[in-house]
Design a protein with these regions (language model features):
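Beta-strand elements of well-folded, non-transmembrane domains
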Residues: 25, 80-84, 115-119
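Extended helical coiled-coil dimerization/tether regions that scaffold
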Residues: 163, 172, 176-296
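RecA-like P-loop NTPase motor core
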Residues: 336-337, 342-450
Length: 557
């Protein structure tokens, strides 16, 4: 079974949020979108200990825009569905027969946690729901809710620095085990040994021998085999290979992640990293032993915190093969470059709710996906985190706008503005991608026939947007001709080594300058010339474009 959607209203930092999940869901966004509140909501409602969390006054949302007014109610709704038709007949799900709701030939479960403040007391109700929101009344609702928590607990992995190696930690608040005492002691012994090895890896990696690594790998296998089933299953892959080039570039046809650990070609450092990750998973489930029938949902929180990008890629190749539903939060462009586009969800907080932007199957055709995969996901993954894309035709403009912004006192990267050269990838796929991900955009086109075609294409895609907001057309053939006519003629003559008295056509002067110097060098020379000139030579149109994109970026904070 698969967690399909969560609806949150009035919980901690989230006013309203509706978020769908895939087999792999990657969440990105700026710091204020409510990541901690979302992950806490999942962790508390699907706790491995199968205990109900008692809501506190601090769990109710405070709307600072409305004068620090605290919400009087909060609600969390989880929606589940089968991975395939007939899965509800499986032994682990048979008991939920009174609560199944059929939609689109699949069985669904709806769970609601509803809390409200009444007479300075918090009253909480938990129910299964019909599709229309009406409560399914059953005398053993709490029992079945706990059973679902046992079947699909949240296992939340954070930075290893948040994990404390405290052998004296109290576990009295949990039902620590339902296993026989001998088996429980063996599990504890294995975990203590694994903890000791991983702690030494963190402090003295050079002192861990190859034999100890091999022994620890076998230990991991014996422990994790209790929680995972590395066998064929009926879950469909997130995307076919045609939609996601290089999807399995690291796994070498390994279906079992442990096979990666024992391959001779893996470096010792890589094995240590992967062992540490898996140990973090085992520890993250807490002091409760998961049942053999459990199918955990893994939350991987900002895994780039302590991993070098190369190690991050190796770790991800290991994690992506784990046969479980995974939720990943990250600020790493390197990690975004190896996940499917359709797994990425960009969250943006607004005064009324947290908006989710994503790419669903079919919204981009195969050709569009190929282009944006190559030009954005693989070569410019940091662009996914931008607030605004400034789309330009050539390399000169990329250098020029970034450097000119510095002269006007702005840092485009700090403002969340990414300058993208679109000529090779095509314009339409980039605009479609920006709109799907909620990224603002503005195009600067040349005044030549090709530039006018780009401008016409933008006009056809405006919808309700104004042309002034989305499009700037240079009143010249290209950026070089535009600058030449705006007072930069002496510079171009100097770069082309042509005297002022030589009445050569503009076109030939610019051609000679470009032939003698690379475009980045010319762009930097233009910036230096602007900076050193006594009068303010920066063209008004360039100032206007910079001001426009900065206003757009600041308007969506």
């Amino acid at each position: 079974m698969h967690l399909e959607r969560i609806e949150i209203a009035g919980f901690r930092g989230i006013k309203r949020l509706s978020l769908s999940f895939n087999e792999l869901t990657v969440l990105i966004g700026e710091n204020a979108w409510g990541k901690s509140s979302l992950l806490d909501a999942l962790s508390l409602t699907l706790c491995p200990s199968a205990e109900f969390y008692e809501m506190k006054f601090s769990d109710f949302h405070i709307d600072h825009a409305m004068g620090h007014e605290r919400a009087s109610s909060l609600q969390i709704v989880l929606r589940w569905h089968e991975d395939y038709q007939g899965e509800y007949h499986a032994r682990r799900y048979r008991a939920f027969d009174p609560f199944w709701v059929e939609q689109n030939n699949l069985k669904h479960l709806y769970i609601q946690i509803d809390s409200h403040i009444e007479n300075d007391k918090i009253i909480t109700h938990r129910h299964f729901l019909h599709a229309d929101g009406h409560i399914i009344k059953h005398p053993d609702t709490d029992k079945f809710l706990r059973q679902l928590m046992v079947l699909h607990p949240i296992v939340r992995i954070r930075d290893a620095r948040h994990l404390e190696y405290d052998n004296n930690a109290s576990t009295t608040t949990y039902n620590t085990s339902t296993m026989p005492p001998a088996k429980n002691r063996e599990s504890d012994r294995i975990q203590r040994r694994l903890d000791n090895t991983c702690r030494r890896l963190m402090t003295q990696p050079g002192h861990v021998s190859a034999a100890e690594i091999k022994s620890s790998i076998n230990t991991l296998r014996s422990l994790v085999d209790h929680y995972f089933a590395f066998t064929p299953h009926k879950r469909s892959k997130a995307q076919p290979h045609s939609y996601y080039p290089l999807q399995n570039q690291h796994d070498d046809q390994c279906l079992n992640p442990f096979d990666q650990l024992v391959q001779p070609k893996m470096t010792k450092q890589a094995k240590l990293i992967l062992m540490g990750l898996l140990n973090a998973y085992i520890r993250a489930r807490g002091p409760v032993d998961l049942k053999r029938i459990s199918r955990p949902i893994m939350i991987l929180e900002d895994p780039e915190g302590r991993l070098h990008p190369i190690m991050l890629h190796q770790a991800w190749a290991f994690i992506q093969n784990m046969p479980m539903q995974k939720l990943l939060t990250t600020n790493s462009p390197e990690l975004l470059s190896v996940v499917p586009l359709t797994a990425i969800k960009r969250l943006q907080r607004t005064p009324q709710k947290t908006v989710v932007h994503s790419i669903n199957n079919g919204e981009l055709n195969k050709d569009d996906i190929r282009k944006v995969t190559f030009h954005v996901r693989m070569h410019r993954p940091s662009a996914f985190y931008a607030r605004v894309w400034l789309l330009v035709e050539g390399e000169t403009e990329v250098w020029l706008f970034n450097e000119m912004a510095q002269l006007t006192g702005y840092n485009l990267a700090a403002e969340g503005i990414h300058v993208i050269e679109f000529a090779q990838s095509g314009l339409k796929p980039l605009i479609k991608l920006a709109r799907l991900l909620g990224i603002e955009w503005h195009l600067v086109a040349d005044g030549d026939p090709a530039g006018r075609k780009y401008a016409d294409k933008v006009r056809s895609l405006l919808n309700i947007d104004s042309e002034r907001e989305r499009l700037t057309v240079l009143p010249a053939k290209d950026i070089e001709h535009f600058l030449f006519k705006k007072g930069y003629e002496p510079l171009f003559r100097q770069l082309a080594n042509i005297s002022e008295n030589d009445q050569m056509p503009i076109r030939k002067i610019i051609y000679r300058a470009l032939k003698k110097h690379a475009k980045p060098d010319i762009a930097l020379a233009i910036v230096k010339y602007t900076q050193e000139s006594e009068s303010d030579k920066m063209p008004l149109l360039i100032r206007w474009v910079l001001k426009r994109v900065i206003i757009m970026a600041r308007g969506i904070i």
